[in-house]
Amino acid sequence: MGLSWTVPLEWGKNHSTTNPLGFFPDHQLDPAFRANTRNPDWDHNPNKDHWTEANKVGVGAFGPGFTPPHGGLLGWSPQAQGMLKTLPADPPPASTNRQSGRQPTPITPPLRDTHPQAMQWNSTTFHQALQDPRVRGLYFPAGGSSSGTVNPVPTTVSLISSIFSRTGDPAPNMEGITSGFLGPLLVLQAGFFLLTKILTIPQSLDSWWTSLNFLGGAPVCLGQNSQSPTSNHSPTSCPPICPGYRWMCLRRFIIFLFILLLCLIFLLVLLGYQGMLPVCPLIPGSSTTITGPCRTCTTLAQGTSMFPSCCCSKPSDGNCTCIPIPSSWAFGKFLWEWASARFSWLSLLVPFVQWFAGLSPTVWLSVIWMMWYWGPSLYNILSPFIPLLPIFFCLWVYI
């Protein structure tokens, strides 16, 4: 049974759609070649539609090997046409246009073409330029010395080495310069640290002083009244409008005087240890001592090479007697004699001191135990004076 059918004329009127029938891939309905007539000149049409997708083999609604490009007889839906297997399109050919991508780095032209002025400099012209004082100042500063003439050399390497090989002042020792700056900086930092700690001594002692008036309670300023009402604050930080401000200043002034007295005592002890104070102890067998500047001793004392000796004058043929004694003991005796001359009641304490010095070891152990028991409290009291210890140590070593 054969199938015969003709193409309706209405299909040929659709000039905007190429190949409307779907099975003439190499022909096009063109009005110029009688496309709307019954006998179109298909073969003589030069504008053929080369539809490569129509020649591809696929599975569609019309069976294997034929895929209508504009829908099958059952419609446009995928269900009507069956399973469509989309084949990927061929990738475009690789472009041979090098202008579209990164351009290769061009070959560097020779130096004679890019910098012709550089080719004018050779060893002779360079040495001639070095004779100019302005140019020589760049290579030979005023601090160094060099020869008056520069001998030409054949190679550039030896030329540069001859320019920078100076015979003059040596290079500065950077290690010595660094250590010279580092020492004062460390001393300045340590001094600033000690100063900040020393400035806290008056406030700490002021807090301890005021705490004696508030045993078992928090210190509160008692200078508040109705005339100058202030908020609750510590007596060690009274504002100027508080009546307790003047008492706070008085306490700190007394504390500063106490610190200065302590430093003065330490200085006197240090001078006495160095043998710079004309203090002489009582010579055994004599009741009087002549104080004055030490004179040259005719007889050297035993064991006085490391420690100073006190030289006391005696009217014995104009010679002086040197006695090796602890300088601290001499200084203590000097202070005791000075205080006893002005305060006669201190002489009453001499028997007590002698008795205390002759106590048994049991009493000394008891004293040590009490110091151990009261040690933490004593540390809290003496802790503000700890920053003074490095200063005292430095003075003791370097004076």
Curated annotation (Swiss-Prot):
Query: Which Pfam families has this protein been placed in?
Result: vMSA
Topological domains (Virion surface): residue ranges?
Answer: 2-180, 274-347, 398-399
Q: Where is this region: Disordered?
A: 84-109
**Modified how:** Isoform M is N-terminally acetylated by host at a ratio of 90%, and N-glycosylated by host at the pre-S2 region.
**Membrane-spanning residues where?**
181-201, 253-273, 348-368, 375-397
Region annotated Pre-S, chain positions: 2-173
Region Pre-S1: what ranges? Answer: 2-118
Its localization reads: Virion membrane
Leader sequence residues: none
Similarity comment text for this entry: Belongs to the orthohepadnavirus major surface antigen family.
Which purpose does this protein serve, as stated in its record? The large envelope protein exists in two topological conformations, one which is termed 'external' or Le-HBsAg and the other 'internal' or Li-HBsAg. In its external conformation the protein attaches the virus to cell receptors and thereby initiating infection. This interaction determines the species specificity and liver tropism. This attachment induces virion internalization predominantly through caveolin-mediated endocytosis. The large envelope protein also assures fusion between virion membrane and endosomal membrane.
The name this protein goes by in its record: Large envelope protein
Organism the protein comes from: Hepatitis B virus genotype E (isolate Cote d'Ivoire/ABI-212/2003)
